[in-house]
Amino acid sequence: MDRHLRIAVADDELDMRDYLQAILPCFGHLVVAVASTGRELVEKCRQERPDLVITDIKMPDMDGIAAASQICKDFPIPVILVSAYHDHDLLERAGEDHILAFLVKPIKQADLEPAIAIATRRFEQFQALRQEAADLRQALENRKLIERAKGLLMKRAGLDENEAFRRLQRLASERNCKLVEVAAMILTAEEAYQPVERARDKNRPGPRHPTG
């Protein structure tokens, strides 16, 4: 792969840590953090903010899956999980915590580089999907605001739907701002005006009843 990554590695075995520190630069990557426990990995990732994590599962004080979950809560990054054996339950946990690749020891050089590329590509795809979902949610919220403001203009100014929308567009153009910003201003102004209107209605004298 062309991209050079800053990588954090964690394993309770010194030989494995040394191996990863030696082999990753051969792919053009920089090892920025090395840890022997899960908690140490979490702390070093907070300090270094790596692009990718390669971590063993079985480690003292906090296993690799729990450490990866904690790291990704702080800032999402791709994680490659390493284990001495296949374990169905561990794989299910790993899936829940968004582990993007899984390697079984002994790690071969021919397997490591593709795993890094796959994890990075999957992470970028997931991030794009999350952003798309966030954009969609924001678009729906914006549409709701605009519809509410349009309905308010129809009620207050006696406009039909098209006229109300054109007025929103004209106001946005005059103020050089987005349609949703104009809608928010109109709704905010209405919220401020409602107590005044209610007080005025309350103090307005009622109809006189004829006497005699």
What are these regions (language model features)?
Residues Q47-I54:
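Active-site beta3 strand of CheY-like receiver
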Residues T37-E40, D61-A66:
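Acidic catalytic/metal-coordinating carboxylates
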Residues A66, H86-F102:
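Alpha4 helix (beta4-alpha4-beta5 surface) of REC/receiver domains from two-component response regulators
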